[in-house]
Amino acid sequence: MNKRFNSEDKIILAIDGLDLSQAKLLLEKCPHVKWVKVGLELFVREGPRVIEILKGLNKKIFLDLKFHDIPNTMSAACFQVSKLGVDIISIHASAGLKALKDSKKASLEGATSVSVKPPFVVGITVLTSFSLKDFQTDLDRNNSIEENVLRLAKLSFDAGLDGCVCSPWEVKMLRSNYKNNFELITPGIRLNIDSKDDQNRIMTPHEAIDNGASKLVIGRSISKAIDPNMALIEIFKSIDSD
């Protein structure tokens, strides 16, 4: 019983690419989903009401808008979204130490202003869509993805953020540097490792958790499954297996 509860707390269902009615139908099919990720597309389409509806369904919400701007703009945005009562928000760690510190402070102030629990703030490191070749070519970087992830995770930690978002490939490396109270949230999770879609640095659920991930963001492996609830149950089983 406790084991299953722990598994439910580790899975964040990404409902990106779905409209609100499709998302609600998916959640009806998957009653054990505890966490939901709302991305940029859905939030822009539906606005803050999507948060109200999901909270009405007793879901915990990762609002993954990946803010990246000057410190004043980022912190102002974090102040506003924190008033919505979401549980986790994401910001780009590459915005710099001041932007991260100011955003964390603003998220606390925003939540406090309406008497809701402050959200965790996590720093985005290197997007899982990047391969090493694309990362070095597109961004004109000479160092490795791992080196950049380490640097951005440290920046997030030093700024007082609650964790970071990284690919499962970097989880083991980061977990050796940071204790379990520093959240490591990992997209790029696939049940079938051959199904990459637009992700490159991917891993199975069991491998990612075994390497030290706190939470897994999983979308298409569940939402595109013939039986989404069965796919979710299989993920729980894989996490629980030794």
Swiss-Prot record:
Pathway: Pyrimidine metabolism; UMP biosynthesis via de novo pathway; UMP from orotate: step 2/2. The active site is at K66. It is an enzyme of class 4 (lyase). It catalyses: orotidine 5'-phosphate + H(+) = UMP + CO2. GO terms for molecular function: orotidine-5'-phosphate decarboxylase activity. Substrate binds at residues 16, 37, 64-73, 128, 190, 199, 219-220. PROSITE patterns: OMPDECASE (PS00156). The keyword Lyase applies. GO terms for cellular component: cytosol. The keyword Hydrolase does not apply. Gene3D superfamilies: Aldolase class I. Pfam families: OMPdecase. Its EC number is 4.1.1.23. Keywords: Decarboxylase, Lyase, Pyrimidine biosynthesis. One of its GO terms (biological process) is 'de novo' pyrimidine nucleobase biosynthetic process. Catalyzes the decarboxylation of orotidine 5'-monophosphate (OMP) to uridine 5'-monophosphate (UMP). Homodimer. NCBIfam families: PRK00230.1, pyrF. Belongs to the OMP decarboxylase family. Type 1 subfamily. This is Orotidine 5'-phosphate decarboxylase. It comes from Prochlorococcus marinus (strain AS9601). The gene is pyrF.
